[in-house]
Regions:
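Peripheral/terminal regions associated with large enzymatic or DNA-binding modules
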Residues: 2-108, 112-345
Length: 345
């Protein structure tokens, strides 16, 4: 009896590791994973949080079926949790796990769809700056869509985690106990830095609140690394990631696009571009301060009148659509924030 025909799988296209974090939403995950399948990375790390109850099990199983379609030569690692830990510390745990097995890695959540050139771009950046401790991360998301730079990427101290990459040296430096908060001198320097550069002032409070929970929040750990080490991130001159997060049921953005202020809405609708290779590298490592200032305007950081305008725009959009429960909830949260009752958890 003849042996069954063996079909050779196509080889990996990019020698890079990719970590995908997902939970129970198969539809957006399928779009992200399709981009990964086309890119054919050499190593794949799949991390899924456990169910909160019976209601999650169907979505969890559907997500696992999505990521089982690995039809290229790829080293696959799976870490599927049986108990739900929540976004935090799941993100931190996933990254610690992946970087125990690889030195360089791309991190994608189930709502960040990268362009195809994002993968070789990250590969080249991860190799080129592997030993440069000034560089903390490689970002795929450019919040301004395009940036006027004569090179294919530039440097910033702004942190964007919608499709990014980093090194084991960075993740290993994270302190999940936030012990640096016990150093009065470090805290004074950080407060002065935040005040002098209009960097998100709530992040210091967030780090304090995160420490109080006893959980590791990777966003505040990454932020504190950037600030305390005067680190820089690499940003492509053209945006390379489309984010699907602003939909009902998403973890961080529960509203629809139609009630989001126009400037913020643009971040969820801008295209993901391809870069041409070979890349044009900047001959120096200096922060593009103008980009950071543009991002501050986008997020209304240090721009109170822009923030007021955004709040009024969002209120009007919700009023037009009769979403009075959303308005009431936002008002209650605003009052609680004024009273100091809102915790960053």
């Amino acid at each position: 009896m003849p042996e069954p025909l063996q079909i050779a799988l196509p080889p990996a296209r990019t020698d890079v590791s990719v970590l995908i974090l997902f939970f129970n939403r198969p539809e957006p995950l399928a779009r992200v994973f399709e981009a990964v399948r086309k890119a054919r990375p050499a190593r794949l790390f799949l991390y899924q949080d456990g169910p909160r109850g019976e209601r999650d099990k169907e979505g969890i199983e559907a997500c696992r079926k999505v990521v089982e379609v690995v039809d290229w030569q790829c080293e696959v690692h799976r870490n599927y949790q049986k108990v739900n830990a929540g976004c935090n510390p799941s993100n931190f745990n996933a990254q610690r796990w992946a970087f125990s097995l690889t030195d360089k890695c791309i991190i994608l959540e189930d709502d960040s769809i990268p362009s195809q050139s994002f993968f070789p771009f990250c590969k080249e950046m991860l190799d080129r700056y592997a030993d440069d401790e000034r560089i903390v991360m490689v970002e795929g998301f450019n919040s301004e869509e395009r940036w006027d730079a004569p090179y294919d990427y530039f440097f910033t101290s702004w942190q964007a985690i919608w499709g990014w990459a980093t090194w084991k040296r960075v993740v290993d430096s994270w302190d999940p106990t936030y012990a640096w908060q016990d150093d009065p001198y470090a805290m004074r320097l950080l407060r002065n830095k935040v005040r002098g550069h209009q960097i998100t002032p709530h992040m210091i409070d967030a780090c304090r609140d995160h420490r109080a929970t006893g959980k590791a929040y990777y966003v505040s750990l990454l932020w504190s690394t950037l600030m305390l080490q005067s680190g820089l991130a690499i940003v492509p001159a053209r945006n390379m990631v489309t984010n699907l997060g602003a939909v009902p049921g998403s973890t961080h953005y529960g509203s629809d696009l139609d009630t989001m202020p126009r400037r913020l809405r643009r971040m969820f609708t801008m295209p993901a571009y391809e870069l041409n290779f070979p890349l044009k590298h900047p001959p120096f490592v200096v922060e593009d301060v103008a980009y950071k200032e543009a991002v501050y305007r986008t997020y209304a950081l240090g721009h109170p009148w822009i923030k007021v305008g955004r709040s009024l725009e969002e209120l009007w959009l919700n009023l037009r659509r009769g979403r009075f429960k959303v308005i009431a909830k936002a008002l209650r949260r605003r009052i609680d924030k004024w009273r100091g009752k809102v915790k960053h958890t």
